[in-house]
Amino acid sequence: MNSSNAIFKTFLGSAPEWYKLCIITFLVINPLIYFFVSPFIAGWTLVAEFIFTLSMALKCYPLQPGGLLAIEAVAIGMTSPHHVKHEIIANFEVILLLMFMVAGIYFMKQLLLYVFTKLLIVIRSKKVLSLSFCLSAAFLSAFLDALTVIAVIISVGTGFYGVYHKVASGSTFEDSTDISNDDKIITNKKILEQFRAFLRSLLMHAAVGSALGGVMTMVGEPQNLIIASQAEWGFIEFLIRVAPVSLPVLICGIATCLLLEHFKVFGYGERLPRRVWGVLARYNVLQEQHMTKQDRVKMAIQALAGIWLIVGLALHLADVGIIGLTIIIICTAFCGITDEHAIGRSFQEPMPFTALIVVFFTIVAVIVDLKLFEPIINFVLSADPHSQLALFYVFNGLLSMISDNVFVGTVYMNETKAALTSGFISREQFDLIAVAINTGTNLPSVATPNGQAAFLFLLTSPFAPLIRLSYSRMIYMALPYTIVLSIVGFFALEYLLPPLTELMTNWGWLIAR
């Protein structure tokens, strides 16, 4: 084997050869397009290539191919290291959240698995179970960050999967096994596939539920805080102003959840296999029998940490990541986890995704520097006031499907605030547009994993390959929700928001500025 073959073989490891050739081709053509064709076209080409690396997440983790594309983009001048640093600092809350909150949830896994195992055993109806996952995710996302909620759901799902996988592999509950290795599973493969489908559907219901709840309050999503700050809305005012759109969408989202389970379409409807239920029930009984006084104290501490988590985030007592760090300290200190390596394991899952998010911010910096969204933004702001709400909603939604919804919401909100300051639009129109931006960035963005950080975190988590949740499958399973949420949101924005906002202002519920 010569040197070039050896380099090609080690490049991107076990990724397919055609994929390696694609990435090499991208790296060759990008500078040529940038210097000899058009920086604008080169920018959109880079965005398309980065989305491609995300869609191939199960073939190769996107950090390496996406990172190489980002490094080259900086090297050829599509953006600067200074601007990348600026984007990272501007989104530092998200990085802190990923580093500490996800690790904090790791130390609450014992309590979460105990509670959700009880839930899974008691609720036998798949419709009720799906609805409970969707609604609990929606409720939690209204007060917590959607990423935190998804981290909880992933932790629980991994726990369920691990319990059954051990038994299916011929091991005991106490054995330490590699749950990514199916070699020892011979007779239970069909049941395992059914269980994977069951977990996929629950996870997708919860993921969409996090978007349904996240749109409702100013703390539900990072961009909501930016919108509330620019519009000078408090928690209650934000909730009331968005309600004419968010409530109809929530009701229709719940109906969609039930209909998908009833008709068993788009990958939904798979019930919990009876044998898996038996394994989980046996595991639950065994846990109860072997639970010591010390175990109960540990779970009580985790429960208190959970209460602090909800209260701290709902009242915004500190940044999300800082609260996550307090969870790590409280749970490890009072549960007796003081070994450095034991603590380090909690950071294994979030760190690769944190690095990927930083690469993503580099792509965002390219979008800003090359003004890729500027033609669309200018078109919307120059449109007739009567059609502005619809256009803001549609273009926010479309851009949020391919880019970070925090970035899209921030850019549109800054431009709209500038239009208000210059007297280009009225305050009443500004308030309505702010709602359109909020709902536009939060609802249609469920269409793809790149739209919402929580969805991207789910796709790139170690749990996704275990349950065979790929990029294309996520899009397919999210499709009915995307259609319903987007259409209902559009009509509520057009026909309910203006008259109900005027009515609530007349009632004194809203302040006319």
From Swiss-Prot:
GO molecular function: sodium:proton antiporter activity
GO cellular component assignments: plasma membrane
Pfam family, one: NhaB
Chain segments annotated as transmembrane: 21-41, 43-63, 88-108, 137-157, 202-222, 235-255, 299-318, 322-344, 350-370, 389-409, 477-497
Domain of life where this protein originates: Bacteria
Topology within the bilayer: Multi-pass membrane protein
Catalysed reactions, as listed in the record: 2 Na(+)(in) + 3 H(+)(out) = 2 Na(+)(out) + 3 H(+)(in)
UniProt feature coiled coil, ranges: none
Keywords: Antiport, Cell inner membrane, Cell membrane, Ion transport, Membrane, Sodium, Sodium transport, Transmembrane, Transmembrane helix, Transport
KW Transmembrane (keyword) present: yes
Compartments it resides in: Cell inner membrane
Family assignment from sequence similarity: Belongs to the NhaB Na(+)/H(+) (TC 2.A.34) antiporter family.
Function: Na(+)/H(+) antiporter that extrudes sodium in exchange for external protons.
HAMAP family the UniProt entry points to: NhaB
PANTHER family, per the entry: NA(+)_H(+) ANTIPORTER NHAB, TRANSPORTER ARSB-RELATED
Protein name from the UniProt record: Na(+)/H(+) antiporter NhaB
Protein source organism: Haemophilus ducreyi (strain 35000HP / ATCC 700724)
Organism placement in taxonomy: Bacteria, Pseudomonadati, Pseudomonadota, Gammaproteobacteria, Pasteurellales
Primary gene name: nhaB
